[in-house]
């Protein structure tokens, strides 16, 4: 999972303060569902997921994406205890929803892509390195309840 340096924490927190959680969340989850279509099976109740435009415009996708990134915002405040922060969500996704833990890694990588698109030149290789470490840590924490 890796240890977060003070520089990592500052880099992650600084960029996070500029993220529009609603826009980035909807785009991140939407892209996950388009790029990795097998993930759609966890979102049967979301209605029309028949095409990229249907997915990207789907209000339930946008709302859940916002919820996901809001949860991530809580983790950013607790980078030294990601496992504790995500204990309940890990249990839910493992025991009740049966989500493949690999999907957490995929979602993290899609988020990094979205941040790169949104922030352009500001999303330097150093910023990306800190964010990759963070999304890997979150994916690991969310996978911690799996047997």
UniProtKB/Swiss-Prot annotation:
Gene Ontology molecular functions: haptoglobin binding; heme binding; hemoglobin alpha binding; metal ion binding; organic acid binding; oxygen binding; oxygen carrier activity; peroxidase activity
Protein source organism: Hylobates lar
Subunit and interaction comment: Heterotetramer of two alpha chains and two gamma chains in fetal hemoglobin (Hb F).
Descriptive protein name: Hemoglobin subunit gamma-1
Coiled coil region boundaries: none
N6-acetyllysine sites (modified residues): 60, 83
Function comment: Gamma chains make up the fetal hemoglobin F, in combination with alpha chains.
Domain of life of the native organism: Eukaryota
Modified residues (N-acetylglycine): 2
Family annotation (InterPro entries): Globin, Globin-like_sf, Globin/Proto, Hemoglobin_b, Hemoglobin_oxygen_transport
Domain Globin: 3-147
Name of the gene: HBG1
Residues found modified as S-nitrosocysteine: 94
Cellular compartments per GO CC: blood microparticle; haptoglobin-hemoglobin complex; hemoglobin complex
Record: residues binding heme b: 64, 93
Family of this protein: Belongs to the globin family.
A Pfam family: Globin
Residues the record lists as Phosphoserine modifications: 45, 51, 53, 140
Keywords recorded for this protein, A-Z: Acetylation, Heme, Iron, Metal-binding, Oxygen transport, Phosphoprotein, S-nitrosylation, Transport
GO biological process: hydrogen peroxide catabolic process
Modification Phosphothreonine, positions: 13
Tissue: Red blood cells.
Classification via PROSITE patterns: GLOBIN
């Amino acid at each position: 999972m890796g240890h977060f340096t003070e520089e990592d924490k500052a880099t992650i927190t600084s960029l996070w303060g500029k993220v529009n959680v609603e826009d980035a969340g909807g785009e991140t989850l939407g892209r996950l569902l388009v790029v990795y279509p097998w993930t759609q099976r966890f979102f049967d109740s979301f209605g029309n997921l028949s095409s990229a435009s249907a997915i990207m415009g789907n209000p339930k996708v946008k709302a859940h994406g916002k919820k996901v990134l809001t949860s991530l915002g809580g983790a950013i405040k607790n980078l030294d205890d990601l496992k504790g922060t995500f204990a309940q969500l890990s249990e839910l996704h493992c025991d009740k929803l049966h989500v493949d833990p690999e999907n957490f890694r995929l979602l993290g990588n899609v988020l990094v892509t979205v941040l790169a698109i949104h922030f352009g030149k500001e999303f330097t290789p150093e910023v990306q390195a800190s964010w990759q470490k963070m999304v890997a840590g979150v994916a690991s924490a969310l996978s911690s309840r799996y047997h």
